[in-house]
């Protein structure tokens, strides 16, 4: 029998998506095949301390904060120099813990923006999902759109503002530019619709700008697209494949954080999408093209708008899509014939394959210094 792989699932973090990260991690831990994997959880509390939970059943039964308080979660630090045992106890014994592959499920700031990926690269650990560069590009929504537009990928138009930019007259200029008073003001580098606000008047615009700047130092303004919200899951490294699309049908004014996670009736999600074959294929191809354009690997969810005249527009790329029991990424693959346990197997395989390919690259270039 093959030796079990040690998988460390990372969750929590210091972003506004902390709680969603925990929900996603619980679903992953519950779904991973215990016959194949030894599973541990690395929980990052709000203030940034790291804890190891090496009994997955306790993680599933209790909140990780509860395990920290009662002492079941061990405080750890990062141990460089031995990639096979990257986690070191802070309890005084200095014990080190194994990881063959890390499954990051830390959404948002410091989880999806390349910071965590950079740490895992320094530890020389295989990890699931996009690398440092791709994570950073996709976290910055204006940068994502700049890259995609340069590559010919259709995107929703946008305008970026920083706190230094004068906002007087901006609303009217954008109204003239897009021909609509209905706009969205959103943080450049947050997800889950945190700090995303619809506006219809200049007063609402000014108020929304002030609110969003409480969360981010840059914001984007976009015209509101009255169309269908379609998503497509992408899986792979060099030769990615796309799932059947899914659709979000919000029951609120828009697909807000509350509609996503707090209101059980906030939206209907479906993988039975009424789209023509040609539009479906177009969405799948654009999703793959966008994935490649930003050099993603492992997984990503590409979010679209489809207008009433079937114009397909990319809204954003999510490199650590949710894995809760209602999340669309695993549901779209399930509908495409890939059950979640097999999906997780493939993601771990892809992470290890990429790491092995990276290890083949020459990292040292030795030359003899010319004598003077």
Swiss-Prot record:
Mg(2+) 2 binds at residues 316, 318. Coiled coil: none annotated. Residues 145-349 form the ATP-grasp domain. Its main location: cytoplasm. Binds 2 magnesium or manganese ions per subunit. Pathway: Cell wall biogenesis; peptidoglycan biosynthesis. Keywords: ATP-binding, Cell shape, Cell wall biogenesis/degradation, Cytoplasm, Ligase, Magnesium, Manganese, Metal-binding, Nucleotide-binding, Peptidoglycan synthesis. It comes from Coxiella burnetii (strain RSA 331 / Henzerling II). GO terms for molecular function: ATP binding; D-alanine-D-alanine ligase activity; metal ion binding. It is an enzyme of class 6 (ligase). One of its GO terms (biological process) is cell wall organization. Mg(2+) 1 binds at residues 303, 316. It is found in: Cytoplasm. HAMAP family: Dala_Dala_lig. This is D-alanine--D-alanine ligase. ATP binds at residues 176-231. It catalyses: 2 D-alanine + ATP = D-alanyl-D-alanine + ADP + phosphate + H(+).
């Amino acid at each position: 029998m093959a030796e079990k792989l040690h998988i460390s699932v990372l969750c929590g973090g210091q972003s506004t998506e902390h709680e969603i990260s925990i929900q996603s991690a619980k679903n992953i831990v519950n779904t991973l095949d215990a016959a194949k994997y030894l599973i541990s959880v690395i929980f990052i509390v709000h203030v940034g301390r790291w804890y190891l939970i090496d009994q997955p059943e306790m993680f599933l039964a209790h909140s990780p904060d509860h395990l920290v308080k009662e002492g079941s979660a061990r405080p750890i630090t990062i141990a460089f120099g031995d990639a096979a045992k990257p986690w070191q106890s802070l309890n005084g014994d200095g014990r080190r813990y194994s990881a063959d592959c890390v499954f990051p499920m830390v959404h948002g700031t410091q989880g999806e923006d390349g910071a965590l990926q950079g740490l895992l690269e320094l530890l020389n650990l295989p990890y699931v999902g996009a690398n440092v560069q791709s994570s950073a590009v996709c976290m910055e929504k204006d940068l994502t759109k700049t890259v995609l537009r340069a590559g010919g990928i259709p995107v929703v138009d946008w305008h970026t503002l920083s706190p230094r930019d004068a906002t007087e007259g901006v609303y009217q200029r954008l109204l003239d530019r897009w021909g609509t008073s209905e706009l969205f003001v959103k943080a450049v580098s947050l997800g889950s619709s945190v700090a995303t606000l619809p506006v219809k008047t200049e007063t609402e615009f000014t108020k929304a700008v002030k609110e969003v700047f409480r969360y981010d130092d840059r914001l984007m303004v976009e015209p509101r697209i009255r169309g269908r919200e379609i998503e497509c899951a992408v899986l792979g490294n060099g030769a990615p494949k796309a799932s059947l699309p899914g659709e979000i049908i919000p029951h609120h004014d828009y697909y807000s954080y509350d509609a996503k996670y707090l209101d059980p009736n906030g939206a209907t999600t479906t993988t039975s999408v009424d789209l023509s074959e040609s539009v479906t294929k177009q969405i799948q191809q654009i999703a793959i093209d966008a994935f490649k354009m930003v050099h993603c690997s492992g997984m990503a969810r590409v979010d679209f708008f489809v207008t009433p005249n079937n114009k397909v527009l990319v809204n954003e790329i999510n490199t650590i899509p949710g894995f809760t029991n209602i999340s669309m990424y695993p549901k779209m693959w399930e509908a495409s014939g890939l059950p979640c346990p097999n999906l997780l197997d493939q993601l771990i395989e892809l992470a290890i394959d990429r790491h092995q390919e990276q290890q083949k690259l020459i990292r040292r270039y030795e030359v003899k210094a010319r004598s003077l």
